[in-house]
Regions:
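Terminal connector regions
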Residues: 2-6, 80-134
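N-terminal edge beta-strand
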Residues: 7-24
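Contiguous beta-strand segments within globular domains
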Residues: 22-31, 75, 79-80
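Asparagine-centered strand-capping/turn motif at beta-strand->loop junctions
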Residues: 27, 31-42
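A short, structured loop/turn motif at beta-sheet edges
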Residues: 36-40, 71-73, 99-103
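Short acidic, flexible loop segments centered on an aromatic residue
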Residues: 38-55
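Intrinsically disordered, low-complexity Pro/Gly/Ser/Thr-rich segments with frequent PxxP/GP/PP motifs
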Residues: 54-88
Length: 134
């Protein structure tokens, strides 16, 4: 029965969108997964997609899937680059991972225009500026 399924709470795992400079000194944006737990997370799958509307027309991006074998304790892992041209969309990241034999999953959504200058802070876990998902 559905009521008998235990769904564990996701703790100390989050996402950030960072602003970086490449070797040509051009601005780039990247999405990272941060594991702030005292233990690794295993067999991590991240499904990303963008959706919303612009000028009254529905828009959506491709759905991408990323596999991370292990994200060690107190580290981060690069998921994907992200283009500023999709910041006006909902940018959704569905993260699933294992701790031992227990699966955990959580949906993270950066709502339209939340990835902006006003929301940029220093992300100490990765030593970069970006927008941290709460």
């Amino acid at each position: 029965m559905k009521k008998d399924i235990e769904i564990p709470e996701v703790k100390n795992v989050t996402l950030t969108v960072t602003r970086e400079r490449n070797i040509l000194n051009q601005e780039e944006w990247k999405v990272y997964l941060i594991n702030n737990n005292d233990f690794p997370i295993e067999t991590t799958l991240v499904v990303s997609k963008g959706y919303g509307e612009k000028d009254g027309e529905q828009q959506k991006t491709s759905t991408l899937r990323h596999f991370l074998e292990t994200v060690s304790a107190h580290t981060s892992a690069l998921i994907e680059p992200i283009e500023p041209s999709v910041f006006h969309l909902n940018n959704e990241y569905w993260v699933s991972y294992y701790i031992g034999l227990q699966i955990h999953d959580k949906r993270f959504v950066f709502v339209p225009d939340s990835i902006c200058e006003e929301n940029i802070t220093f992300i100490k876990e990765i030593g970069k500026e970006g927008v941290l998902h709460s």
